[in-house]
């Protein structure tokens, strides 16, 4: 049998609920998607639970699951993925955190968890921190900028553990939290103490930084602290090619996703202008996927803009991003034709009126370039997906893709 190449397209936070501004439609229902609709003639669709029904998935656990790795077995926390995706090279026993540049007042009350989100000076602030901190109590500290307000912080040294709590209160008008040990070990107490000293040091440096003084003079919020969460010790993960036999690559601008893909052995490409936001280079990402599909068996294409709009409650932004998603699919079909297996879904549901992840299932579409018993539906959205034949978990995705690309191996005699 002919083996087909695979495109797996995830629009982050794609799933939604009825939106008042859209007359009770979801953004995916509201948008006309001619290119995706063209695929329906040879597609099966349905609903996917990224982890299992009702479980509110993070982007980290959902992607592990969709890549065929059970998060209950392999997930240790998000920090290490963020750090790798932001450029860190980790070794065993390193502890990494994800973080936000944020704004606090002089009483450590959070004014804005993202310091306005778009921080043009983020690279310079990270450079200043790396130059002025270096280590605390013998523990080496390194800072890495991801995208927008996102930062990764890596601790290296003896006696560290990821069994410590976050400093991020996850809400505005709340005080920055003290990190606390999550067990009774001396390593947990030591690491929590390091984090608390580090947080105060970060504030001292950033609050007096000339960069932030200029931001304030322009009417912008100072990025004067880093809120830390998701502590994770670095552990090796199985390599994607070893358990799928697929030579794989990914297109993403988001540090978390880049980190996961890199850690399981995928080549990761971030095209010029790809930002992880609504202003990303949509067609540049599609073109990058096209080029990679000439060389690789499996290409993962990630779009963060849908989730960014959802978290901001930006209905028009999510509609715009879904329109661009359809253009991306059209661009790929124009350049490569339809001789591909194509899966399109979201990694979780982020309703734009809720502004947070929920445990709702996400619509899932699987197109194949040959005759199958297709699902008879009119569109690709949450409501039509309920009429399709699929009800799967994230862990089922790779097996489906291997089967329909004619690459699956027989289980048993």
Swiss-Prot record:
Gene3D superfamilies: Alkaline Phosphatase, subunit A, Metalloenzyme domain. Keywords: Glycolysis, Isomerase. PANTHER family: COFACTOR-INDEPENDENT PHOSPHOGLYCERATE MUTASE, METALLOENZYME DOMAIN-CONTAINING PROTEIN. It is an enzyme of class 5 (isomerase). Pathway: Carbohydrate degradation; glycolysis; pyruvate from D-glyceraldehyde 3-phosphate: step 3/5. GO terms for biological process: glycolytic process. It comes from the Archaea. Belongs to the BPG-independent phosphoglycerate mutase family. A-PGAM subfamily. Its EC number is 5.4.2.12. Catalyzes the interconversion of 2-phosphoglycerate and 3-phosphoglycerate. This is 2,3-bisphosphoglycerate-independent phosphoglycerate mutase. One of its GO terms (molecular function) is phosphoglycerate mutase activity.
